[in-house]
Amino acid sequence: YYDMNFIYEIDEGAWLGEKIHAQAGTPGTNVHGEVVVAQRGRDIPLKYDRKSAYEIEEDGKTVIRSKISGVLEDYKGMVGVNHHLPVNGDVGVETGNIDFNGSISIRGTVQAGFSVIAKGDISIDGPEGVSGAKLIKSIDGDVFIRGGIFGLGETRVEAGGSIFVKHVNEANLVAGGDVNIGFYSLGSNIRAHSILVDE
């Protein structure tokens, strides 16, 4: 249950939808046996985010394709693709591990044994922080953990950029930039360009 693949990532150029153009209808007959002339269909424009998608004519249809890679987004009735993945709760049994080619914001926590990997920034906004998570890794960005890290000797946090955390307890942190700790670090291994503790 750790790898549930609940995220369906979309590649650049992927099919998002299509429209068949309005055509003339087929004439019918009413109850009196009289011919009823069909009206031509109305052509309705497609609604999509023009920053993340485009339309193209293919095989007599208007097809919407993605300009960027990311996750499918429905915003006010418009289809689009977003580089940002919001998780409105915890990463745990409901979501499985997350591996995303963009940035991630998590409103809750990352539960024990689960992992989050992102190409961009990772923000974990739950006040309780992280307890026993396996891996939190931002390949090119920063990691922001609003609460602290209770690593239980298991948690590893990696960032291509910097790591920002309230406190660290029994965890391993590796950053290409700085590690910024709000209060304290206890029983942890930390490697970074510089380590800043604000007491």
Question: What residues fall within each predicted segment?
Answer:
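Long, low-complexity, mixed-charge
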Residues: 1-90, 95
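Extended, compositionally simple hydrophobic/Ser/Thr-rich segments
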Residues: 71-199
